[in-house]
Amino acid sequence: MGSILRIVQVGVLGVAVSSCAPTPLPLHTTMDPLKVRKTSLTATLVMPESLKNATPRKEVSCAGTFDVPIGVELETAMTQALSQVFESVDVVEEKRLATHSDVIIEMAIPDLQAEGHCTLRRTLYATGPLYFVFAMFDPSDTYEGRVDLSGTVTGSAGQQLLAGTFNSKTHTKSTITTDRLNRAFAVETVFRESLIDTIQQLIRTLVKSPEFHEYADRRNAKPVQP
């Protein structure tokens, strides 16, 4: 009998531990058209291994703990965005390898922040049988997320064309169910929209900057070397 109880205890503990395990959360980031003028310049995105493999663990209230492969998401999204501005985009692990590009882009690991709000739902659940009476008050969970993204853009001779930190607005997503997949999808959505927000800011700030326009004009006027 004791051995049976021990097996049950171990099984329950295993379920409890597995339920607390972080959930992998790919963001499936895709950049929409930015409606910017494409140049004839070439670009290289520097993605060191530490950035490419960056997978921060984020604990989000009311949702759980998530491992977000933000390095992979950043590379995908930045490549798509830069391809709308530059004739070609290469990706290298070290800046010294970017020897033939007009423009070099370096990024820091994005800072992800998110929190959930589920107090109303939990309060209504506590009412027991009266839950469905009070459900008319829309007991949805709301998740808020934002991203801060720092980056620098330099010319082929090292001249700075852009440097700064871009802060997304706070993006929100609500879900009326407590299903684990719905919670994860809500967190994925606010992270993805926030990352896209910051990349759009970076690209639009770059293409509007006088430094970039002047540099692009000089590179376009430079005679082609035989």
Regions found by a protein language model. Give the residues of each.
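Sec-dependent bacterial lipoprotein signal peptides
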Residues: 1-20
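Small side chains
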Residues: 11-16, 43, 145, 151, ...
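A structural "domain/chain start" motif
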Residues: 20-86, 95, 101, 167, ...
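Surface-exposed short loop/turn segments
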Residues: 21-25, 97-161, 185
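Generic short beta-strand segments
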Residues: 48-52, 108-115, 121, 166-173
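Short secondary-structure boundary motifs at beta->alpha junctions and helix caps
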Residues: 60-70, 134-148, 154-204
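Generic structural signal for residues in well-ordered beta-strands
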Residues: 89-91
